[in-house]
A protein has these predicted regions:
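Active-site catalytic motif of lipid deacylating hydrolases and related acyltransferases
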Residues: 24, 30-32, 79-171, 313-354
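Loop/turn elements at helix/coil->beta-strand transitions in domains of secreted/extracellular proteins
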Residues: 71-73, 120-124, 169-172, 199-203
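Short beta-strand element of the alpha/beta-hydrolase
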Residues: 72-80
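Short, hydrophobic alpha-helix immediately C-terminal to the catalytic nucleophile
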Residues: 186-190
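Basic, amphipathic N-terminal segments that precede the first structured/catalytic domain
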Residues: 21-66, 104
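Surface cap/lid and interfacial helix-loop subdomains adjacent to catalytic sites
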Residues: 152-169, 191-318, 322-334, 338-343, ...
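Gly/Ala-rich beta-loop-alpha elbow adjacent to hydrolase catalytic centers
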Residues: 177-181, 185
Length: 354
């Protein structure tokens, strides 16, 4: 039993932590690689999750339910990078959305273990897109990085526009992403939401897994508590005491909202942990096999723009040596996110109705 639990835990939790930079560095320049065709979002096969059909985004932990078809809100979710192996096709920098093996990985990992965290808050929409290869985060060729990410974002923007026009119909919505998905979600906020009529329908944006400075989304505040709406949250999870290299050029600390308490220290630059929350307040993590919830396993505190947690208490977790818990940004706090997203949707309805 312990062996099975350990294998299941490591197989998911370490998904994005064991990437070898040299192995995954794409030797092909962007200009030498063809670009896969853009997806048509009027075709349902170009969506990982779509209400009205059965897909991985419908799954729920034991004892919980997804929102009904009459749910008052929608969720637009953007998955993280799964295109990380050495490409087996001619498309080296962006995924071909017709790739069945990669699509299956997306469905069985981030859609099942991340997107479902939001299905109590509303109806989940998640597009397939020409995600940029993991190499974009390693390559020294910044022009290649930009071109690959621009292609990925163009798909996300097209999917969002289609979602708004054909599905959302003016309803409140939650925006969520992780890692590369968070990059694209932040661009959506800047280019499609902030300063438009859509901003009035935004319940909240969940943007974990990437460093985002507080002033980078001008016109949209950071959520400062568990009930705030029309705002955004972000965090990046590391083992207690680990200090990642500062990724922001001006030396500022990125936003870190504690996903257990949903408190925000306001970016105060102090060499002490802010807003520490004991693991007894942790609502639960989701690991393989999907369905079981592990409660009271994580504590959390904010330090200089990152979320510190002591090594989570799971079967076999004593073997974890990595200090980067990026792969667990959402599923480590699965029930905390699930409860909070639904709570903000409820609060949004109260505020709008007042």
């Amino acid at each position: 039993m312990l062996r099975l639990s350990l294998v299941a835990f490591l197989s998911f939790f370490l998904l994005a932590e064991v990437l070898n930079a040299q192995h995954y560095l794409n030797p092909t320049r962007f200009a030498e690689s063809p670009v896969p065709p853009a997806p048509d979002y009027s075709d349902s096969k170009n969506w990982c999750a779509l209400p009205g059909r059965v897909d991985e985004a419908d799954k729920t932990p034991k004892g919980h339910r997804a929102a009904s078809a009459e749910a008052p809100a929608d969720v637009f979710y953007i998955h993280p990078t799964l295109y990380s192996d050495e490409p087996k096709t001619e498309f080296k920098w962006n995924q071909d959305v017709r790739d069945p093996d990669l699509n299956r990985q997306v469905d069985e990992l981030p859609i099942r273990y991340q997107a479902t965290a939001f299905n109590a808050a509303g109806l989940v929409y998640a597009p397939r897109y020409r995600q940029a290869h993991y190499s974009v985060f390693l390559t020294p060729h910044l022009d290649d990085k930009k071109r690959a990410l621009d292609i990925a974002y163009a798909d996300v923007e097209a999917a969002f526009d289609y979602f708004i026009k054909n599905h959302n119909q003016g309803r409140p919505f939650v925006l969520a992403g992780h890692s590369q998905g968070t990059l694209h979600a932040a661009h959506l906020l800047k280019h499609r939401i902030i300063g438009t009529a859509l901003q009035g329908n935004l319940v909240a944006a969940y943007l974990p897994g990437m460093p985002i400075p507080a002033d980078s989304l001008a016109g949209l505040p950071v959520c400062t508590d568990s009930l705030a709406t029309g705002c955004w949250v972000s965090w990046r999870t590391f083992r207690w005491g680990y200090r990642p290299i500062a990724p922001i050029g001006d030396g500022s600390d990125p936003v870190c909202v504690n996903p257990i308490s949903w408190s925000y220290s306001g970016g105060v630059k102090r060499d002490t942990v802010q807003g520490y929350v004991h693991r007894h307040h942790h609502k639960g993590a989701a690991l393989k096999p999907f369905g079981r919830i592990y409660r009271h396993r994580c504590d959390a505190g904010s330090y200089r723009g990152v979320l510190w947690v002591h090594r989570p208490r799971f079967p076999g977790s004593f073997l974890i040596r990595s200090s980067n818990y990026h792969a667990g940004d959402i599923n480590l706090f699965y029930m905390d996110v699930r409860h909070n997203a639904a709570l903000r949707v409820q609060q949004f309805a109260v505020v709008r109705g007042s």
